[in-house]
Amino acid sequence: MILVDVNLLLYAYHPRAEQHEKSRAWLEEVLSGPDLVRFAWLTLWAFLRIATNPRVFDRPLSTSEAEAAISSWLAQPAAGILEPGERHWDLLRGLVHDGQTAGALLMDAVLAAIALEHGAQLCTTDRDFSRFSGLRWTNPLVEAR
């Protein structure tokens, strides 16, 4: 089971993003493949917030376009939502302490805790996730790590 980070979603939906083609191809492949693909609500909210922001993109998506993208992902048979469970708070506290995480990196710790709690591998291009001990993560846009 994989858990998808927002950076891959943003790259896949913005043609001017440097990693657009690779991200789009990867996302289409995993959503049509046999593996379980999971999203966290915070990732989907971040996609809505960032993808529609004209301060971030010269040509942001409309809210309707961003909502349609999310709906299309969730409609795939392999897709679903991972939510924090009963162990989330304890896992998050440990990650925040051990990874010396604060500020902007706190949401990374939340996503890492969700992945750890459910045994998911996090797919991201963000190397900051290497700070979280025990987290299985990969950058699917590179051949080998």
Feature locations, PLM:
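Acidic, PIN/NYN-like endoribonuclease modules and their adjacent C-terminal/linker elements
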Residues: 1, 112-145
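Ligand-binding beta-strand-loop-alpha-helix segment within the catalytic cores
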Residues: 73
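Acidic active-site catalytic centers that drive phospho-/nucleotidyl reactions
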Residues: 5, 108, 126
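Short, well-structured N-terminal submotif of metal-dependent ribonuclease cores
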Residues: 1-3, 7-39, 54-68, 144-145
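Short beta-strand segments at enzyme active-site cores
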Residues: 38-41, 124
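Structured helix-beta-strand junction loops
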Residues: 33-34, 76-77, 118, 132
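Active-site neighborhoods of divalent-metal-dependent phosphate/nucleic-acid chemistry enzymes
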Residues: 60, 78-123
